Amino acid sequence: MSNRRSKARTAALQGLYQWQLMGQDVDKIDIEFIVQDIRGIDHAYFQELLRGVPQRQGELDECLGPFLDRPINEVDPVECAILRIGAFELLCRPEIPYRVVLNEAIELAKRFGAEHGHRYVNGILDKVAQKVRATEFRSRALRRRLQT
């Protein structure tokens, strides 16, 4: 995860973690990141995630809910933030291929989540992708079948 957008996801994860655990205002979180002068990130994308996830939290949690094995408030806070970022991208950024969304989320979970958190994140977001990106999911499966 070395590109600007990947770094924006990492920063958004950190900001959303603060928002989830401490209820800190996203404007203040954004200012903290500006003051830190984090270089090499897509700041506009960071802001989109940092603001978009809280704004659409209800919709995101509703989308994730059927695939979770427990209530969302009982999911590890880091993994919860990663799942919400992934669900946001799957729902709101259709130009980003679902495989990219899943791979980025898995990498975040490997770096910041619990020992096997990446498996949990992958399993949940894969099911969300099948639901909300059904056409993209089916066309990828069809291409694979045609190649064999």
From Swiss-Prot:
Cystines in this chain: none
Domain of life from the UniProt record: Bacteria
One cellular component (GO) term of this entry: cytosol
Extent of the signal sequence: none
One MF term in the entry's GO annotations: RNA binding
Name of a matching Pfam family: NusB
Coiled coil: none
An individual GO BP term: DNA-templated transcription termination
Record keywords: RNA-binding, Transcription, Transcription antitermination, Transcription regulation
Job description of the protein: Involved in transcription antitermination. Required for transcription of ribosomal RNA (rRNA) genes. Binds specifically to the boxA antiterminator sequence of the ribosomal RNA (rrn) operons.
PANTHER family: ANTITERMINATION NUSB DOMAIN-CONTAINING PROTEIN, N UTILIZATION SUBSTANCE PROTEIN B-RELATED
Family: Belongs to the NusB family.
UniProt protein name: Transcription antitermination protein NusB
Native source species: Nitrosococcus oceani (strain ATCC 19707 / BCRC 17464 / JCM 30415 / NCIMB 11848 / C-107)
